[in-house]
């Protein structure tokens, strides 16, 4: 479903510049308990789950809780955010993470359960250092940029033993 479809659904709050890649699932049972800030990206197959159906088998009620995602947040592919979680501004959730507790602003978390790995500043410094010794590619090296066979072969060869960066 697109961001436009989401915005109209039962009071789900979504900020500006929200990007949701394919396969994401935003809890259709309790969308009004989910708030997504500005400039947020949900990578492929992210799940935002505001209820715990397993509790119903035990106590007759589903546990529910709000999910609040701050501004400038990236949530990596196949991550799951569980009920009663706040993800602070300027944070990154690594791929395949399960977020069971609040994530402070300005950190990178990863794992199951998600734990702090480093600060955003440390992450940025690490990336910048890596960029100094890695191939860097412009927009024309993407499908959207109309990459051709020659550029694909060049990129594939250059990335044989290292990673690189694309705009």
Feature map (PLM): residue ranges:
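Terminal amphipathic alpha-helical/low-complexity segments used for targeting or macromolecular assembly
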Residues: 1-11, 114-167
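Structural signal for interior beta-strand "rungs" in well-ordered beta-sheet cores
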Residues: 6-8, 12-117
């Amino acid at each position: 479903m697109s961001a436009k479809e989401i915005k109209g659904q039962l009071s789900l709050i979504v900020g500006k510049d929200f990007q949701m890649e394919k396969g994401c699932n935003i809890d259709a049972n309790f969308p009004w308990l989910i708030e997504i800030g500005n400039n947020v990206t949900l990578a492929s197959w992210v799940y935002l789950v505001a209820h715990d159906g397993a509790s119903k088998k035990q106590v007759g009620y589903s546990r529910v809780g709000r999910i609040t995602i701050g501004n400038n947040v990236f949530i990596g592919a196949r991550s799951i955010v569980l009920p009663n979680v706040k993800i602070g501004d300027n944070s990154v959730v690594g791929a395949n993470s399960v977020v069971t507790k609040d994530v402070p602003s300005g950190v990178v978390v990863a794992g199951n359960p998600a734990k702090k790995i480093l600060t955003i500043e440390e992450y940025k410094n690490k990336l910048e250092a890596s960029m100094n010794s890695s191939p860097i590619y412009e927009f024309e090296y993407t499908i959207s940029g109309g990459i051709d066979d020659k550029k694909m072969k060049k990129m594939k060869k250059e990335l044989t033993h290292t990673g690189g960066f694309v705009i």
